[in-house]
């Protein structure tokens, strides 16, 4: 987890139902939420069955916010990809996976906040939703990636090796939405 707001939610519950033991790490503690330039050492992914990189309220490219630790996360994602460890990147996590593998991330033409539908090339992999969204950025995919879902704002899902990146939030719970709203989210919704 990148912060105290996000949690594995529905994805974590499904993994546990299937017998996986979850190990979660929090990069930015609650008291540093508005000053997230912390030091953090990411674990090596080699012994894991799966890496899930969740959302975050910051932008992957915002050096003042994430510059002190994003390099470590990008290295972890590159190594997981190299080793063939499956990666699920959600929102910020998908943007980090994109960046780690040679793509780029920038501002979206408009934010997406709330429930949206998407167009999917493979509905068995990515149903068309509606999906919950809360983001301001979009990905320009790395060379190896294949876009599998989109809408008029941005790529919504892509595959790359054994990785899957999604811009929406399949893990979302009402508890996390309330946390988003309590931490600057109400102001974002009013814009």
Over which residues does each language-model region extend?
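Glycine-rich His-Gly loop
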Residues: 1-3, 54-59, 136, 168-170
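Short glycine-/acidic-enriched loop or helix-start segments at secondary-structure transitions
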Residues: 8-10, 62-64, 97-100, 142-143, ...
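N-terminal, positively charged, Ser/Thr/Ala/Gly-biased leader segments
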Residues: 1-11
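Cofactor-binding loop segments of dinucleotide-utilizing enzymes, especially the Rossmann-like FAD-
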Residues: 2, 27, 92
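Amide-donor transfer/coupling interface in amidating biosynthetic enzymes
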Residues: 42, 106, 120-191
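Ligand/cofactor pocket segment of small-molecule handling proteins
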Residues: 93-130
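Flexible gly/pro-rich beta->alpha loop and the following alpha-helix that scaffold active-site loops
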Residues: 13-88
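A short acidic, often aromatic-flanked loop/helix-cap motif at beta-alpha or helix-coil junctions
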Residues: 30-34, 113-115, 139, 155-156
């Amino acid at each position: 987890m990148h912060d105290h707001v996000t949690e594995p939610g529905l994805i974590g519950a499904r993994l546990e139902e299937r017998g996986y033991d979850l190990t979660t790490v929090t990069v930015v503690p609650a008291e540093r939420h508005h000053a997230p330039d912390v030091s953090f050492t990411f674990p090596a992914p080699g012994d894991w069955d799966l890496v899930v990189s969740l959302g975050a309220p910051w932008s992957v490219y915002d050096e003042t916010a994430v510059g002190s630790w994003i390099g470590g996360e990008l290295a972890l994602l590159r190594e997981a990809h190299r080793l063939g460890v499956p990666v699920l990147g959600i929102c910020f996590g998908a943007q980090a996976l994109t960046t780690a593998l040679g793509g780029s991330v920038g501002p979206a033409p408009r934010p997406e906040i709330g429930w949206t539908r998407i167009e999917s090339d493979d509905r068995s992999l990515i149903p068309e939703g509606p999906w919950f969204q809360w983001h301001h950025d979009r990905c320009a995919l790395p060379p190896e990636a294949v876009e599998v879902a989109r809408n008029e704002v941005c790529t919504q899902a892509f595959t790359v090796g054994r990785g899957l990146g999604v811009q929406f939030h399949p893990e979302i719970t009402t508890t996390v939405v309330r946390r988003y709203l309590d931490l600057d989210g109400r102001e974002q919704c009013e814009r």
